[in-house]
Amino acid sequence: MAVTKLVLVRHGESVWNKENRFTGWTDVELSDKGRNEAQEAGKLLKAEGFTFDYAYTSVLKRAIHTLWNILDEVDQQWLPVEKSWKLNERHYGALQGLNKAETAEKYGDEQVKQWRRGFAVTPPELTKDDDRFPGKDPRYASLTEAELPLTESLALTIDRVTPYWEEVIKPRVASGDKVIIAAHGNSLRALVKYLDNMSEEEILELNIPTAVPLVYEFDENMKPIKRYYLGNAEEIAAKAAAVANQGKAK
């Protein structure tokens, strides 16, 4: 049976991850730790014999720079890369820039967990005159008003990620190309939920660690037959638990 592989990678730790802030579409840089994480991911992929034919990422530099660091390590800097806003992080609305623990102290752990992990729950909206509104950013100039979010739930994130998967990425993977996607915690959760047909309850508890390669194997019908992380299982579990704890009051 022919097996096709796909690699998903959440970006390395960003400056706002380090500060425990809601980031969303805010374009923040990787921290020093995040750059190191991305480099280690690339080294791990190289050691495991992975090479790629094509790459996808978002239009946010923490994901783009994660991909660059990985491609440096596997010595494929020349690889064709397609960037799309449809792979952006979920838009966190008026929460963007706020500290997660302080927000939990104000609104309670359960409310923040629902904002972060609830399937159809949207954070408070931005207003269009807010400087954080994506309509003010030139990289989104081609988007229609309906496409510019004021906030997003995971369900709404799925609504933009899955058509991009079906129409753009999946045909390339199905053709036999070896593809890597460098994106974000929630855009990747959206894709994992779709690929694995997860329930809303299951996706609530899924936390994707930073810069750990997640490998999918597909059969000839593009049905997922295996999903696994590369790396030390205990370290990966600890990183995933740290992601889960970000939204709790101290």
Swiss-Prot record:
Binding-site list for substrate: 10-17, 23-24, 62, 89-92, 100, 116-117, 185-186
Site for Transition state stabilizer, residues: H184
Residues annotated as the enzyme's active site: H11, E89
Family to which this protein belongs: Belongs to the phosphoglycerate mutase family. BPG-dependent PGAM subfamily.
GO terms under biological process: gluconeogenesis; glycolytic process
UniProt catalytic activity: (2R)-2-phosphoglycerate = (2R)-3-phosphoglycerate
PROSITE patterns per record: PG_MUTASE
Species this protein is from: Proteus mirabilis (strain HI4320)
Entries under SMART domains matching the protein: PGAM
InterPro entries for the chain: His_Pase_superF_clade-1, His_PPase_superfam, PG/BPGM_mutase_AS, Phosphogly_mut1
GO MF annotation terms: phosphoglycerate mutase activity
Enzyme Commission code: 5.4.2.11
Pfam family of the protein (one): His_Phos_1
Gene3D superfamilies: Phosphoglycerate mutase-like (3.40.50.1240)
Signal sequence region: none
This protein's encoding gene: gpmA
Protein name, entry field: 2,3-bisphosphoglycerate-dependent phosphoglycerate mutase
Quaternary context: Homodimer.
Pathway it works in: Carbohydrate degradation; glycolysis; pyruvate from D-glyceraldehyde 3-phosphate: step 3/5
Keyword tags: Gluconeogenesis, Glycolysis, Isomerase
